[in-house]
Curated annotation (Swiss-Prot):
The gene is rluB. Residues 254-320 are annotated as: Disordered. Signal peptide: none annotated. It comes from the Bacteria. Pfam families: PseudoU_synth_2, S4. InterPro entries: PsdUridine_synth_cat_dom_sf, PsdUridine_synth_RsuA/RluA, PsdUridine_synth_RsuA/RluB/E/F, PsdUridine_synth_RsuA/RluB_CS, RsuA_PseudoU_synthase, S4_RNA-bd, S4_RNA-bd_sf. This is Ribosomal large subunit pseudouridine synthase B.
């Protein structure tokens, strides 16, 4: 073994490379009692590696099945594992697993909702996030401001932002009234607030932003906000093949999951779990659950894969 420490730890399932690089930079990782440095290579697989003082394995989990969740992130949740102020995070509602942990594939701003993928495979997460892979992300965005042919052309051709040139791969107009306009936009990287900053460069303010697609994985219209579903084997392998990883042969869920009755029961189960979570986090101390009970927000309809792509031709585009 002679590889960079963050790569070894990512393959062992302790996080994505970016997450682990941040941990190493902050001095939270040690090797044989010595604080590790970014770029350090691990040559001995018997070395004692600690993260936050806890000994962790550096052996690749070859026999652990790669799992992927599709989560419908609501507005207001933070993409972090722990928040010192006690605010909700995207990890709060995910199912508990033994011997591994969920790793988020990228991030969404607190005020952005929609599809967020999680996986148990750190290498898969890292490759999907890396700009060199050019994995498409599609968003439904509502903007306030004057939008014309010239501005749309700028967004497609490219705009110089603080961190370099950025552009939309596609901009599709879906309607609007007055100064409010709704578009589907596609980008192939995940820079911080990139969609919002692109529109701001054209003097338009984003009033609503929702991710509806990552690669060819679409936000399921049956999924409520705050709900999750585990991807089937074919979808997991689509993501793995997209970034040149070997396909999986097993899955943790049933292969035959097409029954309407089963789908309906699963959807109801997810909704009940979301409701219980909402009641728990919204109950002030000293008050009963019944006194603080409120209804969870209804999931708004979302265009699925068929509607998003097959109806693309029916969306009227502004003249470029």
């Amino acid at each position: 073994m002679n590889e960079k420490l963050q790569k070894v730890l990512a393959r062992a399932g302790h996080g994505s490379r970016r997450e682990l690089e941040a941990l190493i930079k902050s001095g939270r990782v040690s090797v044989n009692g010595i604080v590790a440095k970014l770029g350090e290579r691990l040559e001995d697989e018997q070395a004692v590696v600690r993260i936050d003082g806890h000994v962790v394995s550096v052996k690749a989990q070859e026999e652990v099945i790669c799992r992927v969740l599709a989560y419908y992130k609501p507005e207001g949740e933070l993409c972090t594992r722990h928040d010192p102020e006690g605010r909700r995070t995207v990890f709060d509602r995910l199912p508990k697993i033994r011997g591994s942990r969920w790793i988020s594939v990228g991030r969404l701003d607190a005020n952005t909702s929609g599809l967020l993928l999680f996986t148990t495979d750190g290498e898969l997460a890292n490759r999907l996030m890396h700009p060199s892979r050019q994995v498409e992300r599609e968003y439904l965005v509502r903007v306030f401001g004057e939008v014309n042919e010239h501005k749309v052309r700028n967004l497609v051709n490219g705009v110089e932002l603080d961190d370099g040139l950025a552009r939309f791969e596609d901009v599709v107009y879906t309607g609007g009234e007055g100064m409010n306009h709704t578009f589907y936009v596609v980008i192939n990287e995940g820079r911080n607030r990139e969609v919002r900053r692109l529109w701001e460069s054209q003097d338009c303010t984003v009033s609503r932003l929702k991710r509806v697609r990552y690669g060819d994985i679409y936000l399921d219209k049956k999924l409520p906000r705050g709900g999750w579903m585990e991807l089937e084997l074919k979808d997991v392998n689509y993501l793995r093949e997209l970034v040149e990883l070997r396909p999986e042969k097993e899955t943790m869920i049933e292969l035959n999951n097409s029954s309407r009755k089963r789908d309906r029961a699963r959807s109801q189960k997810i909704r009940r779990a979301v409701k219980r979570h909402e009641e728990r986090v919204s109950t002030p101390k000293g008050r009963s659950n019944n006194a603080a009970r409120r209804k969870p927000s209804k999931a708004d309809g979302q265009t699925n894969k068929t509607n998003s792509r097959n109806q693309a031709g029916s969306r009227s585009k502004p003249q470029r």
